[in-house]
Structure formats: structure tokens, C-alpha cells
Curated annotation (Swiss-Prot):
Family of this protein: Belongs to the universal ribosomal protein uL4 family.
Protein name: Large ribosomal subunit protein uL4
PANTHER family per record: 50S RIBOSOMAL PROTEIN L4 (PTHR10746), LARGE RIBOSOMAL SUBUNIT PROTEIN UL4M (PTHR10746:SF6)
UniProt xrefs under InterPro entries: Ribosomal_uL4, Ribosomal_uL4-like, Ribosomal_uL4_dom_sf
Length: 209
């Protein structure tokens, strides 16, 4: 598929780029997308939750009342989970939620995510640009020129560009990543995908394998 190349002023440069059909025009595999997003979100979890169980609650193990003759149910330690302040039955323990996913599935998921954005016509290709210094106002001007000021957008760079990244960091709806940092979640979480020309070769090289 062919896409027009714009400059940072939102004007057409008169050039077009050919996007690989094997990356941007496949039939999306929804299950692969589901698995990759699930893995990404699972990996974000700290898993540090912890509740004290019966043996871990502070306090005496003394039997709180005699076994018979009270007319009420038998009771042992005040740590019994039935009592207020007692331990929790099968409480949460610290654990890792991460799980492995084959590289083939991850690549398929990302190709599917790119294809979904292409089908929705939400991909913009912009010629490479740099800022001499971090400047949020300059980045906002780029968003305005591209019609993305109030939209959640993801800019994909070919190489790490510190000034461009720092210029966007204070913008809540804008995310800037290099092609090596891309995830299926990041692609789908953005309404619009802005691909800098320099990122295309790396994207297609990584995902065409």
C-alpha cells in the first residue's frame, strides 16, 4: 500500500512510500493480539500483594474460651480467620504474573496491530525531523499541523531522539517510541499512528521475518 509523506507542517512533500503488505495489509489475528496484549499488561503488574494468614498474624495462640459448657460454638485461637483481626484464608502471596510468548506470535500480533490501523486509515507517514533542544511548544505545533492536537497519538522514531522525546513527555495524549520499543498494546492504544520515514525500514525488517 502507498502512503503520502507529509512534513511537520502537515503539507504533502510530493513523495509516497510503499508500506509492506506483509506487515500493514494482513488479515488481523485477533487471538495473537489478545495474547500479546495480555502478556504486556501482565508484565506491568508488580505482584507484591500479600495478606497475613493464620500463622502470621501477631497475637497469642491461647484458647479464648473453654471447649464445653458455654452454649456457643467451639473456638481456639483469636487468630482464627472467622474472627475480626484473624488471619486470612488462602490470602494473596507475592508472585510474578509474567508468562512467555513465542516470538512468532508476538510478531504476528504486531503485524496484526499495524494492519488494523491501516484498515482504519489511522497511519500517517512524516519525514524525519529533529529539535535542536527540548521544546514542548514546537511539538504541539507539529500536532496541530497534523490535526492530532486533541487525539491520542503514537510517534514512532527510527532512532532514539532525546530532544523529540523530551518535547513530548509532558503531553498526556502523546507517546513517542523507537521501532525497537514498540508493543502491540502501544500501537492499539493510540488513535493515530505517526510513522517517521526513518522507522519504516526497521519496522518491516523486524516484522517480516
Amino acid at each position: 500500500m502507498e502512503v503520502k509523506v507529509l512534513n511537520i507542517n502537515g503539507k504533502e512533500t510530493g513523495r509516497k512510500v510503499q508500506l509492506s503488505d506483509s506487515v500493514f495489509a494482513i488479515e488481523p489475528n485477533k487471538h495473537a493480539v489478545y495474547l500479546d496484549v495480555k502478556q504486556y499488561l501482565a508484565n506491568q503488574r508488580q505482584g507484591t500483594h500479600k495478606a497475613k494468614e493464620r500463622a502470621e498474624v501477631a497475637g497469642s495462640t491461647r484458647k479464648i474460651k473453654k471447649q464445653k459448657g458455654t452454649g456457643t460454638a467451639r473456638a481456639g485461637s483469636a487468630k482464627n480467620p472467622l474472627f475480626k483481626g484473624g488471619g486470612r484464608v488462602f490470602g494473596p502471596r507475592p508472585r510474578s504474573y509474567s508468562f512467555k510468548l513465542n516470538k512468532t506470535v508476538k510478531r504476528l500480533a504486531r503485524r496484526s496491530a499495524f494492519s488494523i490501523k491501516a484498515q482504519e486509515a489511522n497511519i500517517i507517514v512524516v519525514e524525519d525531523f529533529v529539535f535542536e533542544a527540548p521544546n514542548t511548544k514546537n511539538f504541539i505545533n507539529v500536532l496541530k499541523a497534523l490535526g492530532l492536537e486533541d487525539k491520542k497519538s503514537l510517534f514512532v522514531l527510527g532512532d532514539s531522539n532525546k530532544n523529540v522525546y523530551l518535547s513530548s513527555r509532558n503531553l498526556k495524549a502523546t507517546n513517542v517510541l523507537t521501532n525497537s520499543e514498540l508493543s502491540t498494546y502501544a500501537i492499539l492504544n493510540a488513535n493515530n499512528l505517526v510513522l517517521l520515514e526513518g522507522s519504516l525500514e526497521g519496522i518491516e525488517e523486524n516484522l517480516s521475518k
